[in-house]
């Protein structure tokens, strides 16, 4: 019984540590978005692209919370917005 409980606990820990990268594509083959999950939480960079292949926006997540710079570009690649986050909260410069 004790071994079964320990085995279940270890299995739950391992599942929670597995990282999975999800990528979706436009019909023309260009990337649409890419994000990384750790268990049920976003964890790592999340990037969106325009259909022309230009980056649209990027933000990093840590344990399901925004963490780091959030950057938005227009279709020509010009940065049009930037915010910084720490532990899910916007940080003033």
Language-model features, listed with the residues they occupy:
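Sec-dependent signal peptide recognition
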Residues: 2-8
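Glycine/tyrosine- and acidic-biased, solvent-exposed loop/turn segments at the edges of beta-strands
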Residues: 3, 13-93
